[in-house]
Regions:
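ATP/NTP phosphate-donor binding region
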Residues: 1-58, 288, 295-299
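Glycine-rich beta-strand-to-loop/alpha-helix junction loops that act as flexible
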Residues: 12, 61-63, 88-91
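Catalytic core of DAGKc-family lipid kinases
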Residues: 21, 79-84, 90-192
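Short glycine/serine/threonine-rich phosphate/pyrophosphate-binding segments
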Residues: 43, 65-70, 95-96
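Short Gly/Thr/Asp-enriched flexible loops that form oxyanion-binding sites at enzyme active sites
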Residues: 66-80
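Short hydrophobic-aromatic micro-motifs
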Residues: 128-141, 189-198, 203-204, 218-221, ...
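Internal helical hairpin/lid segments
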Residues: 191-243
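ATP/nucleoside-binding phosphotransfer catalytic cores, i.e., glycine-rich phosphate-binding loops
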Residues: 223-299
């Protein structure tokens, strides 16, 4: 195999920041050319370069944010549906890797030769792709304020936990949701502290992996947070657990969120503000190598 037909993009300082040399060695053994990021935005630039050069198999070593940057670059080069993605978990929470059944760096490299290739849904928001989730609402600094330790334990939910901690002084936003697909159309209007849109992640009941091949988002609208001194993680389970009156659950292929005021959106950790945003799925748009524990139809 010609080196260059397989390319790995690595964030050498993601996670604990001690994986770079191991990744270089394993990548060479698997025939991957290695491109490394040096700062913010490099993942997107390198992803676009890979797309423009016609790379057919790409590996990304970093966290969910690095993967998101690379996918945005591939999308900008109109190459998202022309490439096979290999995920090498090198971040803190590694939510996408977990959903794909990829345990660690060595396991990720093992799968570059023998992992099953599945065609997975890609979420789109504001014209940009995301794989794990898009979260709307909460104060703008909730995502960046989430601690590394919290992200390690809860991943994307760290944003929700931090938001709940700050929601004591946050009155919520007047929102309208218009939802389509999944057997019909629906709408919701009212005051909410957050809207959780999951592609690889479910936010209700027991959480965990969502169905990434059904063309639908799992959507949860959280109206308010529990009062009192309830522990934050218990609050998460109370909020998102089955039968909670303050949470509304939908499944939809397209979700439009509209507000009179700017709303903060966190798309796999990438922050933007809009008073109107539409999220939709591109069904089975990205070929991804998965581990043997990946569940195409999770319960």
């Amino acid at each position: 195999m010609q080196v260059g037909s397989r390319t790995l993009i690595m964030n050498p300082v993601s996670g604990t920041g001690d994986h770079a040399e191991l990744v270089r060695q394993l990548a060479r053994g698997k025939g991957f050319a290695v491109w490394e990021t040096e700062g913010a935005g490099d993942g997107r630039a390198l992803g676009r370069r890979a797309g423009e050069e016609g790379v057919s198999e790409i590996a990304v070593c970093g966290g969910d944010g690095t993967i998101n940057e690379v996918l945005r670059g591939l999308n900008a080069a109109d190459h998202l549906d022309e490439v096979t993605l290999n995920v090498i978990p090198g971040g803190t929470a590694n939510l996408l890797a977990g959903a794909l059944g990829i345990r660690d760096i060595r396991h990720g490299f093992d799968l570059t030769d023998k992992g099953e290739i599945r065609s997975l849904d890609v979420g789109m928001a504001d014209g940009e792709p995301f794989m794990v989730s898009c979260i709307a609402g909460f104060p703008a600094d909730a995502s960046t304020a989430a601690s590394g330790e919290l992200k390690e334990r809860l991943g994307t939910l760290a944003f929700v936990v931090t938001g709940i901690q700050e929601a004591v002084e946050f009155e919520g936003l007047e929102l309208r949701l218009d939802l389509h697909g999944g057997g019909g159309s629906d709408s919701w209007e009212g005051s909410a502290v957050t809207v959780l849109v999951g592609n690889a992640r479910r936010f209700i009941e027991e959480g965990g992996q969502a169905d990434m091949e059904d063309g639908l988002f799992d959507v949860a609208v959280v109206e308010d947070v529990p009062a009192g001194n309830l522990a934050v993680e218990a609050a998460i389970h109370r909020l998102l657990g089955e039968g909670t009156d303050s949470v509304h659950h939908f499944r939809a292929a397209q979700v439009t969120v509209t507000s009179d005021d700017p709303v903060t959106f966190s798309r796999d950790g990438e922050i933007a503000e809009h008073d109107r945003a539409t999220m939709y799925t591109r069904p089975q748009a990205l070929d991804v190598r998965v581990g043997p524990e990946y569940e195409p139809r999770p319960d």
